[in-house]
């Protein structure tokens, strides 16, 4: 009663939309939400689940898996590779260097994070030969020594040093942090341009917090010499991409209207 909250209703609420549309702002930016479900992740999400034939001794048995089983009971290297390829090929780029914009990828487990980190580094080496040398992506989980320091370095744009794309440009060489839950809450990195949901999310609080990692405003700046002086190049961050591979947005809001839909080819998988 002291604070006038006996009704249970908040006396003040400041939403993402409020932050985007604030007349004194904007103070936040909206995501461009990408529906990137594969055939397999779509079936894992269905009520009937995803059924595959599994060899058990001399017999084949049908096993049915659901979203909660991904990277716990159901494993598919092809699906993980498809997630990585889709993310890399469609990620927002840094407006100054043209390299993949900084991002955070959320995985099911530490083992899953290790797999995805390796796949991202291999794919980045093909896209940008000799630019990263396995520093493109870094696993940031609680079992990694120095992980907390890595998150700070990523925030300060010196994780693995600075980008090799443009001398003097203050941006991390490491572009993607791969985590499970460490960077979900209380982490503020303003120049994030890409968020990858490589796992299903069932907690609305976690979903809101993860989405919030990309909403901070930022201006990308770089100065070049021109006509005996300096010319400043400035690009305000107007949005970020949220890659939803497991229909998380639809899970929390039925018939969610995605901003972009990527049709992915069919792949095979085994349990």
Predicted regions span which residues?
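Short, conserved catalytic or adaptor-binding loops enriched in Gly and charged residues
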Residues: 4-6, 18-25, 127-133, 167-169, ...
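Conserved C-terminal RecA-like helicase domain
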Residues: 63-177
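Short glycine-/polar-rich loops that comprise or flank the Walker A/P-loop
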Residues: 7-12, 24-30, 100, 132-136, ...
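Interdomain helical connector at the RecA1-RecA2 junction of SF1/SF2 helicase-like NTPases
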Residues: 2-101
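Flexible phosphate/Mg2+-sensing switch loops adjacent to catalytic phosphate-binding sites
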Residues: 2-14, 125-135, 218-230
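Conserved RecA-like P-loop NTPase helicase motor core
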Residues: 138-265
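Long, largely alpha-helical accessory region at the distal end of helicase-like NTP-driven motors
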Residues: 65-72, 82-85, 246-271
